[in-house]
């Protein structure tokens, strides 16, 4: 189980598998034992076992491979969790390919929050974010929690992983990325604004992806291929953390912010991402941009397309559907199956015969 810090990985595993023993490699003594003397580690912690923050002992994976191969008939003996996805995946690919199942845990979705706390609306979720701790304890100040989260992330993850010596520069980089959430990523612009090189931006951006803080969405072109050399769009994975980084404290401040549109688009991305991950269809999500015409999100399935445009409004303008029509013509009218405008309306409706209007809360239902 991978995912950003504080998404609930440990809680989910311990709640779901109460009969398993538990050890966290966040403890330096346990991590050192697991890395330098794996056999002694397994003798101290026999299966069935949950191993938390397993990325701190990469040598453990080779020894797990031997044990799994020796007990092929006994599934679920070792449950692993880690908050640094890409290094973890490299170790898994080298040692445990074909021997484990992988799950990535995101922060809570809008629908998960509303199912647990009736009466909560999508705007509250956007502003507060999806970290479980914030919804389990509503008295916690969300912005203080998120600021502490950033400080912890800078100190714990970056110092050890990237050997970043100037944390203030990285914090400026983090805020520069937050100001660009929901927009095309131009690394040269970011490098200029922060005062670092483009290779440094590339390295630091990889760290944000690794830790589950941001995601990149690739463009789609009419020849049916992803243009990997073109600019992707950048999205923060949690809107509450995003709002903390751009100093938007509450719903009223969000409504007055010039960033309300990109922030709402980021929330739509998060909703799409969570729903599509559950279905194993995340690779189907792209965006289309050509000659100044863009549709925020496009789902492609078997040569057919669903289009999603995001609007920070309660009543979409019919001209929004006309803008989508230009992209429909680009993709081929017969290839486009459905068109949606996602906005802050209360109920599903139609803007015309071809285009449906849906609230953020109803978005998973139409996928």
Where are these regions (language model features)?
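Conserved lysine of the Walker
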Residues: 9
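Hydrophobic positions on the alpha1 helix immediately C-terminal to the Walker A/P-loop
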Residues: 12
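Short glycine-rich substrate-engagement loop in P-loop NTPases that contacts/grips substrate
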Residues: 20-48
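Conserved catalytic/switch belt of AAA+ P-loop NTPases
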Residues: 61-80, 84, 94
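Short regulatory helix/loop adjacent to the ATP-binding pocket of P-loop NTPases
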Residues: 86-101, 118
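Domain-level recognition of nuclease-like catalytic cores that cleave nucleotide substrates
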Residues: 107, 117, 344-367
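Accessory nucleic acid-recognition modules appended to NTPase machines
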Residues: 139-305
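Active-site ExK catalytic segment of metal-dependent nucleases
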Residues: 300-316
């Amino acid at each position: 189980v991978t995912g950003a810090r504080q998404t609930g990985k440990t809680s989910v595993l311990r709640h779901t598998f109460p009969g398993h023993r538990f050890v966290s490699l966040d403890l330096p003594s346990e991590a050192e034992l697991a890395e330098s003397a794996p056999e002694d580690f397994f003798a101290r912690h026999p299966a069935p076992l949950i191993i938390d923050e397993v990325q701190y002992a990469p040598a453990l994976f080779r020894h797990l491979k031997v044990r799994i191969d020796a007990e092929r008939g006994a599934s679920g003996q070792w449950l692993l969790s880690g908050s640094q996805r890409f290094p973890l995946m490299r170790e898994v690919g080298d040692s445990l390919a074909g021997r484990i199942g992988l799950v990535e845990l995101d922060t809570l979705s809008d629908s998960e929050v509303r199912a647990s706390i009736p009466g909560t609306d999508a705007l509250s979720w956007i502003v507060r974010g999806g970290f479980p701790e914030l919804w389990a304890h509503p008295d916690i100040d969300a912005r203080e929690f998120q600021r502490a989260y950033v400080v912890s992330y800078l100190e714990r993850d970056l110092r050890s992983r990237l050997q970043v010596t100037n944390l203030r520069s990285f914090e400026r980089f983090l805020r520069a990325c937050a100001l660009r959430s929901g927009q095309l990523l131009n690394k040269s612009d970011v490098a200029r604004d922060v005062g670092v090189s483009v290779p440094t931006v590339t390295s630091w951006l990889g760290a944000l992806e690794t830790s589950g803080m941001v995601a990149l969405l690739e463009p789609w072109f009419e020849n049916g291929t992803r243009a990997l050399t073109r600019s992707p769009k950048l999205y923060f994975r949690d809107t509450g953390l995003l709002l903390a980084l751009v100093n938007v404290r509450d719903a009223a401040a969000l409504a007055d912010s010039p960033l309300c549109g990109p922030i709402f688009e980021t929330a739509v991305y998060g909703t799409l991402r969570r729903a599509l991950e559950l279905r194993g269809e995340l690779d189907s999500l792209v965006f289309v941009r050509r000659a100044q015409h863009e549709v925020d999100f496009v789902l492609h399935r078997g040569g057919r397309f669903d289009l999603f445009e995001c609007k920070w409004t309660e009543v979409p303008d019919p001209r929004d559907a006309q803008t989508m029509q230009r992209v429909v013509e680009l993709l081929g009218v017969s290839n486009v199956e459905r068109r949606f405008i996602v906005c802050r309306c209360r109920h599903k409706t139609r803007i015309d015969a071809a285009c449906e209007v849906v609230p953020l809360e109803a978005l998973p239902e139409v996928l």
